[in-house]
Amino acid sequence: TGAALTPVGLNGAALQLFTHGTITGLLFVVVGLVYDRAHTRHIPELGGLMRRMPIIGVGFVVAGLASLGLPSTSGFVAELLIFLGTFPVFAWATALSAFGVVLAAGYILWTVQRTFFGPSQARNDNLPDAKLVDAVSIALLLLPIMAIGLYPKLLTDVFDVGILPIISRLGG
């Protein structure tokens, strides 16, 4: 039996589809908000933004940490289920994928540090933080990232309704 034909593996894959959409969506929102205010995406020009844009900064930091699979976020749960589903069948590929998570952590933490926590740039001293509509958008995307990270059964039980019949029909 293949790794993809286990409830754990398929739940991980389905959860990854959902969580990738919310995390990446949040990253696009906050990067767009930074660009709208700073008119640049050049990281060396964006140091110290957390002091000027704390709401946008929190959105970026949480999305970045969820993207690299920080425990208590939906990114962690999805990656864990995928790894648990693939390891018994493809141990070497799972280990290689886990190394990819380490690489992702490196570039995400590098970006977060230099953009939001690095030395402040004078050109950014008057940048405004999120407006109410922006803050609501950030919060609405943060909510499922954290809720699914803390209680994944909110979605995995829903996914099982479709996953279990597929496994049964395929002889898994």
What are these model-derived regions, one by one?
Residues M53-I56, I108-G172:
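Cytoplasmic/organellar membrane-interface segments at the starts of transmembrane helices
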